[in-house]
């Protein structure tokens, strides 16, 4: 059972707390950061296990190279920075030194998407899903809330191979009652709300907004199935095949190459007779502003999502 709780808590905090838990469980787990540990929350691990924490400085490419080297010695490696730098600046090193040899490196990137806020376009990474899912051997995940993040981090620690996880800067609304409810399995989507008229597939911090949109649609006599798609690669093709004839994707990411692109590929490759509406960042750069204002500006808040869906349904 999921619901909009009205309680907000940072996924980054869930990440930091879970790193400490995993550090106690796995003596071969190490954590790297690129001089942003206070923001990424890896500082929690550094305080608890200083001998297993390495600050690479503002040198993300070097950090990934260090992570790859440590992984070859049997370490479980977590490497973190802001998503713009962890995925963008370090992309070639990730491709050639981590993904190509399929090393056990987990790149956990924070401050993803438009809701970075006042930092503006230079820090608003809305292309990371696209560039990371294009890399062979790479798993790409966007957790939903604080509790869900904890289970995502636990799961990828046990998975042997490269993983990219993105999470936002802001505190996001909790939709799960506890960790037990916030189940996660790599490559599996999850139906959160049953519906008959359309399917909304959302990922990351947009899942609560999709739930909010679903409530507004219900008030207007429209029954929406809501699907949480935490793993964008490998994507759950079966849940897409079983979706309604009208599919809407929602993401805090470019509609090019992100969740919308991934769902479009499944629909096209399988010859599915489904209408697709992609809601996300429409091939533009971000701008400075408060997170909530930016969500509304780019049409990514629940009210705007519902309005866009109703407008689209009137065309049918």
Curated annotation (Swiss-Prot):
Its EC number is 2.2.1.1. Binds 1 thiamine pyrophosphate per subunit. Coiled coil: none annotated. Pfam families: Transket_pyr, Transketolase_C. Its cofactor is thiamine diphosphate. InterPro entries: PDH/Transketolase, THDP-binding, Transketo_C/PFOR_II, Transketolase-like_Pyr-bd, Transketolase_BS, Transketolase_C. Disulfide bonds: none annotated. It catalyses: D-sedoheptulose 7-phosphate + D-glyceraldehyde 3-phosphate = aldehydo-D-ribose 5-phosphate + D-xylulose 5-phosphate. Keywords: Thiamine pyrophosphate, Transferase. One of its GO terms (biological process) is sulfur compound biosynthetic process. One of its GO terms (molecular function) is transketolase activity. Transmembrane segments: none annotated. PANTHER family: PYRUVATE DEHYDROGENASE E1 COMPONENT, TRANSKETOLASE-LIKE PYRIMIDINE-BINDING DOMAIN-CONTAINING PROTEIN. Belongs to the transketolase family. This is Putative transketolase C-terminal section. It comes from Methanocaldococcus jannaschii (strain ATCC 43067 / DSM 2661 / JAL-1 / JCM 10045 / NBRC 100440).
